Amino acid sequence: MKQLFQVEMVNESVNTLNKATKVLMIIHPKYLSDETLYMIDQWILKGGPTLIFLDPYAETEISRQQGVPPINPRSNLKKLLNTWGIDFDDKKAVLDAEYGFRISRNINGRDIQVTNYPWLNIRGDGLNQNESSLSNLSTIVMTTAGSFISNNDEIMLEPIITSSIKSGLGDAQKAGNPKGDPRDLLSDIKAKDQKHIVSGWIKSDLKTSFQNFKK
C-alpha cells in the first residue's frame, strides 16, 4: 500500500486527523477513548471515506508479554455500530462447511486431514460480482472472520463478501485454537440456508453516537 499511497499511521489516542487525509482506515480497534471515537464519528458523518476492519480473534496479534497469548484478541467498535444499527458479535467467528480449508492437523498424536471450518477460502457466489473492488479476484482467504448484521431497516448493508449457506457462527476463541479439533465446531454449523456477511458497505445516512459530547 505504501508503494501506491502516502500512508500515515496514527496511534489509538489520536483525536484529530491530518487535514490532507483522504481515506481513514480503522484496523482492529480496541480501547478507543470517547475523544477518538468522536473524531471517527464526525469524520464519517461529514462523508469521510472509511474502511473498518474488525476481528473476533486476531490470530497474529502480538502479545505484550512474550510467550503469553493476547488477553483480548477481539476488536470493538460497539459504541458506533450500536448507533448505526449494525451488529458485530466480537465473540463469534464464521464457520463454513463449503468454503472451509482442508488441512492436515495433528490431533491426539496423529496427522489427520480435516476441514478447518473457520479458515475460509471464499469464492464464486461468496464474492459480490458487481463490486468493482473485487473485479480481479477469484478467491479471498480469511481466518476466524466475524460477521455483520443490520438490525435497522433504515440502514442498508450491502454485502461484498459472504459465507456459503452451509455456514454458522461459533465461539471465536475455540475456532482460533491452532491445536483444536475443527470437527468439534461442526455442531455450530446448522442448516439454516443463511449466508453471513463477512464484509459489506454501509450505504445509508448515519446518526451520531455523541449527541451531547463536549470536547
Annotate the PLM regions.
Residues M1-K215:
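Acidic, S/T/G-rich, low-cysteine, solvent-exposed domains in lumenal/extracellular/periplasmic regions
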